[in-house]
Amino acid sequence: MTDLGLYLSRKSVNRSDVSRKTGISKTRLSELANNTKTKLRADELYLIALAIDVDPCEILKKVCKDLALKEE
């Protein structure tokens, strides 16, 4: 499961509702939640955040928590 999948699961998000509100297919949401090789686009993240009524930055911090700048 991806970080997005874990986040949505912890929030008890109904993916059918998210799909209906955002226009993102249930298949795509499933890929985003389960396949670590699938890349989440910024527009998808923003729409998902709007659909579940959270600040997009909250999701971004969870999904990108492992990213860091390279040390010089």
Q: What is each of the regions a protein language model found here?
A:
Residues 36-50:
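Short, basic-rich loop-to-helix N-cap that marks the start of a DNA-contacting helix
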Residues 2-21:
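Short basic helix-loop element that most often maps to the first helix and adjoining turn
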Residues 6-7, 12, 31-32, 50, ...:
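Short, charged recognition helix plus adjacent turn
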Residues 25-38:
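Recognition helix of helix-turn-helix/homeodomain-like DNA-binding domains
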Residues 17, 28, 58:
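Residues in the helix-turn-helix
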